[in-house]
Amino acid sequence: MAAGSELRPMIPVVTPDEMAAIDAAAPEPATTLIARAGAAVARAAIDEMDGCLGRRVVVLAGPGANGADGRVAARRLALRGARTTVVDVSGVGDRLPDADLVIDAAYGTGLRRPWTAPATESPILAVDLPSGVDPLTGCAMGRPLPAERTVTFAALKPGLLLGEGRRLAGRVEVVDIGLDVSSATAWLVTDDDISQMVPSRPVDAHKWQSACWVVAGSSGMEGAAGLAATAAQRAGAGYVRLSVPGGRAHDRPPEAVGWPLDRNITVDPGEVARFASMVVGPGLGPSGEVAAGVRRIVADTSVPMVVDGDGLKALGNGMPC
């Protein structure tokens, strides 16, 4: 990240139904929102082509708001000197004209049936969502056009993140066009979000200021223990202790310290108190005595704890919801 740049917050993710409600609640007319969306598409097109004057742009435009966004972009690009051609999706043939860029404004999130896109070898910029991708599941419905880049509005859609949609969307840019997405119930966590969660270590820090005890693994599942220990190290733990109940931590990273622990996961509370966090569960296996040990350590331990894998199974089988 460049020095002085601002950290981006988590990105909202909304379903098609949620997006429809957000659009309906917009305080401004649809024409204003379409103008903003089209301007954003035009800017992205210029960026993709590294210029505009004399560039050939084909806009595949549908009948709805997606097509309207594309037509606005076409007019703006023409004003900047691009040679633009708008092809109405209702009359398109098997192949699009050659171009420096094709703007897919055919259907976006509005398609609910299989669609075979016309052939093209030109790079593609998709508007909101590659046409032919299910906006909820990311499944390809028919034969969509694979985009180099997708400009989507207000929030991400699940179809941009899931299934084939993730590949077909290419690089995704979320553009603010003035819609209120505060009602979103799902958010994409970015690298910037994670960087804010992981604290910086002071120069005079020592290992016990952020020690983590990992209780994980079993016979045949030693790799889970090693992965959990490595994750703790990468999250910033200065000292990682790894215990495989009733076994040895064969696959532990060399920086992690092995510590014997019986199958009952009997731990000294005073020893636990030395740690800033614990990880319990990955790869522990279905043993009843191990499950009982997990429930006991969760009940008796006050340090922050991540419970995963077989640890969650142990809690689900032994504790009321």
What do these predicted ranges mean?
Residues 1-85, 101, 149, 160-321:
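Small-residue (G/A/S/T)-rich helix-start motifs and N-terminal tracts that mark the onset
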